């Protein structure tokens, strides 16, 4: 269940490159698609779940042909079912949000890079709710970052991240 990146040029030529190498084998749909966002003037930021031998969430930067950040960076707490990442890049600032769950609560965790994904500030739990909730989505509006999140208890939330 590895991922690939496809580039299509103006003549509709397609170049497909393998993007992850976890080797996870599953005979089902795990409902964990990757998150991808353009990385400034070049390349892409990508976050994904791998359920193989080293299960968890991973982040990397790819230029479309090869990994720029290697090895991929692990993030999230697997003990709290970290999953469903969302990515947003605004200039050199990269936002990475994901969901974690414990016995009764759901959390949204946010990590920020200010240098195009090379280094990351410490991840912080920024929202909490009891009961069921949707997955986080990061949205850009007027060059600012927002979190979109829907919960059973607290309803829909649209939160400025700065």
Predicted segments with their positions:
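Extracellular, repeat-based ectodomains that mediate carbohydrate processing or recognition
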Residues: 1-162
């Amino acid at each position: 269940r590895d991922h690939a990146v496809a580039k299509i040029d103006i003549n509709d030529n397609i170049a497909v490159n393998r993007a992850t190498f976890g080797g996870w084998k599953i005979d089902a749909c795990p409902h964990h698609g990757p998150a991808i966002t353009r990385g400034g003037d070049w390349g892409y930021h990508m976050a994904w779940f791998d359920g193989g031998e080293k299960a968890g969430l991973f982040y990397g930067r790819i230029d479309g042909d090869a990994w720029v950040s290697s090895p991929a960076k692990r993030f999230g707490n697997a003990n709290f079912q970290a999953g469903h990442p969302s990515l947003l890049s605004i200039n050199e600032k990269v936002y990475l949000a994901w969901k974690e769950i414990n016995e009764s609560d759901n959390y949204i965790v946010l990590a920020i890079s200010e240098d195009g994904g090379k280094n990351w500030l410490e991840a912080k739990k920024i929202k909490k709710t009891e009961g069921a909730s949707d997955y986080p989505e990061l949205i850009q509006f007027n060059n600012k970052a927002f979190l979109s999140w829907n919960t059973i208890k607290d309803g829909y939330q649209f939160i400025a991240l700065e």
